[in-house]
């Protein structure tokens, strides 16, 4: 018999659980202080009431009901209104501030009856208990408390409600719960973490077990924003989006020719090169073409301020300010270090949802990669590209190469495998002078020009000239000239090798 699941309503978490939490069973949500355990349990109840019309009971062993209601308000959840509508009941089991003496044998019979009565009275389908740790802290006999909690869970299962219990742990990767017994009395275990990585906090959620059913394995990043918890279940993303044959212009006619007629409408383009090679200018031309077609576009800038972007675009004859005034362009500027990658991803998704652009640009990915782990950065890129493709948006990303000249790697963070089109921009030294070169390194699903061509930046924007004839190893950082005889000799040698094969 298949286990029925109850959607929590927490964005992304139900994807990790592959449908939600098992119905009529208990789930332990464990984490260190500040990981979001109480927020998780409140969001579970609030979404159940508001989205699934399932009344709930919240049992608090730590904070007072007044504090619970006040804190929930910061996420836009009006618990008092739900209480007034008899859709939510908050049972206060918090300790007496004046202290209390325990006489005789400890049991939770009275509390169990109060919870049972509230469930029946309000016809509750969901219960949240915050937290089990507080119960253990109030009483010394751990084995007795474990027995009583087991009784409580058994009663809740008998009634048929789906329960979420929180518990505190000491270390992010230590024992599941502080007293080492909480996980054994629950059917399911969810772990919330708030790990310090490169001087930044990164929140993750892991479903350790869902008894009798399947779930996704591993840790998944999440954020706590204005509307509560959002989980980024990247592993749940499916490659089911449609693929368009419609072409869009890059804003540079010669580059369109190099790409076989322009970019595909739903493609992700990456321009990579050293600083000053013209990446931001290509972004500006890409955005200008959207405006020319009366399409909306959005820019996420992590290296330059809005004023700098406007000034630079103006120098190329592009009026970003007018585009903004016409409601066809939105510019979001932020320091990469202002928040974590997951929060940046959530901001990008929110802005795209609200503005509904047909094109987006991120300048640059390398700025966001500073001071974060390779895995976290890769997850961010997958999240952005996946969402852009889901919304059928053309995306243009830039990446600043560390090497000023010579070859550089674009595969270290696996960005190259995620993007559809890659433009290589590079400085080259020819006859004692510095020049720029451009090459369409990759274009998925289309013919493209393989030549390395000269790339010139003028007051009117970019110009793409002919290829560097009679030169080879342009991108190696040490180009050298070949004579006409050498070139012809090379052709015959190549033909000779083919004949021998």
UniProtKB/Swiss-Prot annotation:
Keyword list, A-Z: ATP-binding, Biological rhythms, Hydrolase, Kinase, Magnesium, Metal-binding, Nucleotide-binding, Phosphoprotein, Repeat, Serine/threonine-protein kinase, Transcription, Transcription regulation, Transferase
Any further remark recorded for this protein: The kiaA gene has been eliminated from Prochlorococcus during genome streamlining. It has been suggested that the central oscillator in Prochlorococcus does not have to be as robust as in other cyanobacteria because the former live in specific niches of the Earth's oceans; they divide exactly once a day and at the same time. Thus gene loss, and changes in kaiC function compared to other cyanobacteria, can occur.
Domain text: In the homohexamer the 2 domains (called CI and CII) self-associate to each form a 'donut' layer; the compactness and local conformation of the domains varies over the cell cycle and impacts function. CII has the autokinase and autophosphatase activities, both CI and CII have (weak) ATPase activity; CI has the clock pacemaker role.
InterPro entries with a match to the protein in the record: Circadian_clock_KaiC-rel, Circadian_KaiC_bact, KaiC, KaiC-like_dom, KaiC_C, KaiC_dom, KaiC_N, P-loop_NTPase
Positions annotated to bind ATP 2: 275-280, 316, 436, 442-444, 446, 448, 450
Binding site for Mg(2+) 1: 38
Protein name (Swiss-Prot/TrEMBL): Circadian clock oscillator protein KaiC
Catalytic activity, reaction form: L-seryl-[protein] + ATP = O-phospho-L-seryl-[protein] + ADP + H(+); L-threonyl-[protein] + ATP = O-phospho-L-threonyl-[protein] + ADP + H(+); ATP + H2O = ADP + phosphate + H(+)
EC number: 2.7.11.1, 3.6.4.-
Organism the protein comes from: Prochlorococcus marinus (strain SARG / CCMP1375 / SS120)
Cofactor requirements of the protein: Mg(2+)
Assembly, per entry: Homohexamer; hexamerization is dependent on ATP-binding. Component of the KaiBC complex. KaiC interacts with SasA, activating its autokinase function and leading to RpaA activation.
Domain of life: Bacteria
Residue positions where Phosphoserine is found in the record: 416
BP term (GO), one: regulation of circadian rhythm
Modified residues (Phosphothreonine): 417
All copies of domain KaiC, residue ranges: 1-232, 246-501
One GO MF term attached to the UniProt entry: ATP binding
Pfam families: ATPase
Sequence positions that bind Mg(2+) 2: 280, 303
